[in-house]
Amino acid sequence: MNHDSYSDSYIRGILNTVKTIAMVGVSPKENRPSYFVFKYLLERGYRVIPVNPGQAGKEILGQKVYAKLAEIPEPIDMVDIFRNSAHVPPIVDEALTLQPKPQVIWMQLTVRNEDAARHAEAAGLKVVMNRCPKIEYGRLSSEISWIGVNSRTLSSKRAQTLGTGVQRMRLGPASADDGN
């Protein structure tokens, strides 16, 4: 897969499918990007589980923090990595030992590791690198276009709210190739 660009349907398919996200490297500090993304995804209805060895046993926004992925007592759909690119391979290796395996490895902005991506894809996982799910969610739902940001999703209508569930905003049109 070309990890320099992703189709909207690929990203939309992931964000519409995953429900439980393990966020590796989330910070309890309110001024950190990982905290913003963690809070945003929680507010959109995702189950987000913080993973940070230095904060293990504590809580971030009411969610128990785990030291490592293997300690999480429930299935994970996506692993969102907020760590330096050099730290990605052991995180992917650990994710691949989970049963069931997660569906997606997502590496945040500036995080890329081609070897880890190939390893995850060889095991059947989808991979996204150098992207932020908060930004992608806002762009695809047209949510950020209402605050003056060009989301590349043109609409004269306010983003649709879905009420309760996995997400609060509809992520654009459904298509037959979502998830490809």
Task: Map each language-model feature to its residues.
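Short, acidic/turn-prone active-site loops that include or flank metal/cofactor-
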Residues: 54-55, 70-71, 108-112, 131-136
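A charged, well-structured terminal subsegment
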Residues: 136-180
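Glycine-rich, highly charged phosphate/nucleotide-binding loops
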Residues: 3-7, 58-74, 80-90
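Short N-terminal or domain-adjacent regulatory/targeting segments
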Residues: 1-17
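NAD(P)-binding Rossmann-fold cofactor-contacting core
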Residues: 29-31, 39-59
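ADP-ribose/adenylate-binding Rossmann-like module
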Residues: 95-123
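Short, charged, surface-exposed secondary-structure boundary motifs
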Residues: 59-61, 76-77, 114-118, 136-143
